């Protein structure tokens, strides 16, 4: 298995020029390039205070998130969807598998469709590197991870980033685990809190040094992290998960690397043929002092909670 981190720097290092993009109107999304060979290798997206990047080498998934020009989630990690197949390994965004007997050849998530929208209009004129800005952004993509059909989207509007992963199993697949969505919070965050819709369940301080730790929160619905030095914090709220599948919060505290949050499902289970389920998160940010950060985080949680349709899990 190969992890493919920070590869956009290697591939795009020589591209120092920019080509203007165009936004279509009546033509519709069908005018966007069909072939991945014509898709952008890196897209920098700015909507209000939020900035993110869509990374081609990571199979057109997000790569880091900034808020008010401050790094909230690092680029040096995988986002999107990853599955761990029993006796095979990790496969998905930024996780590739070596093909047995074929040195140098890898198996990847097969992305078959990519559409970008700014201010609800399709973006045309794809170029290797693009800068997009507006009042709203949406990315829609379709892919296959072996027998799994995946439809995923990223939407930024009104100060909230919403990410969705819809999985459909065309055949049964034996899994160690699946991570439908994940976020690599900055290692600069020093404190955290987990909670449900009733309030905070757990709070703590991240490690400053030492070996990484990977706890699991099975009953929490959201995670908040905060960096007193910047006065900024991030929240991931689990809006939706299938009623017949778990939606746990697994997190890795890796000092100096990241504070990684993963939505975790199908742990040591077979995903049955015909499974059809949606996982969705809302990402929001806030400013606060060291004294009132939990209060500000809870207020932001309430705002993100309003995005939940339905309120608990997929019907």
Language-model segments: residues:
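Extended amphipathic alpha-helical segments with heptad-repeat/coiled-coil character used for oligomerization
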Residues: 202-218
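Beta-strand-rich recognition/accessory modules
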Residues: 32-50, 55-57, 224-315
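Extended, loop-rich substrate-binding clefts of extracytoplasmic carbohydrate-active enzymes
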Residues: 91-158, 172-178
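Low-complexity, Gly/Pro
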Residues: 1-32, 313-315
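Acidic (Asp/Glu-rich), glycine- and aromatic
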Residues: 157-199
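Solvent-exposed N-terminal domain segments of exported/luminal and surface proteins
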Residues: 35-120
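Short hydrophobic/aromatic-rich beta-strand segments that constitute the beta-sheet cores
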Residues: 54, 141, 150, 163-165
């Amino acid at each position: 298995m190969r992890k493919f981190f920070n590869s956009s720097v290697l591939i795009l290092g020589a591209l120092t020029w920019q080509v203007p993009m165009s936004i279509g109107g009546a033509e519709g999304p069908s005018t966007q390039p069909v072939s991945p060979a014509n898709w952008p290798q890196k897209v920098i997206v700015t909507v209000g205070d939020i900035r993110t990047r869509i990374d081609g080498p990571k199979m057109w998934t997000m790569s880091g998130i900034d808020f008010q020009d401050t790094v909230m989630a690092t680029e040096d990690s995988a986002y999107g969807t990853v599955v761990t197949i029993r006796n095979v390994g990790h496969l998905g965004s930024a996780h590739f598998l070596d093909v047995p007997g074929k040195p140098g050849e890898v198996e990847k998530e097969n992305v078959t469709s990519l559409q970008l929208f700014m201010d609800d209009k399709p973006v045309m004129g794809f170029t290797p590197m693009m800068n997009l800005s507006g009042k709203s952004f949406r990315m829609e993509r379709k892919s296959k991870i072996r027998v799994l059909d995946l439809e995923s989207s990223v939407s930024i509007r009104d100060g909230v980033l919403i990410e969705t992963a819809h999985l459909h199993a065309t055949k049964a697949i034996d899994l160690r685990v699946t991570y439908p969505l994940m976020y690599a919070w900055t290692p600069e965050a020093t404190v955290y809190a987990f909670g449900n819709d009733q309030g905070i369940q757990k709070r703590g301080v991240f490690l400053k040094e030492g070996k990484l730790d990977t706890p699991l929160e099975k009953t929490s619905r959201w995670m908040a992290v905060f960096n007193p030095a910047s006065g900024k914090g991030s929240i991931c709220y689990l809006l939706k998960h299938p009623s017949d599948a778990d939606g746990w919060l697994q997190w890795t505290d890796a000092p100096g690397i990241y504070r990684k949050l993963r939505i975790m499902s199908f742990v040591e289970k077979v995903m049955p043929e015909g499974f059809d389920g949606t996982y969705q998160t809302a990402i929001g940010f806030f400013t606060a002092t060291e004294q009132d950060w939990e209060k500000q985080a809870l207020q932001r949680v309430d705002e993100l909670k309003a995005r939940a349709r339905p309120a608990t899990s997929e019907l």
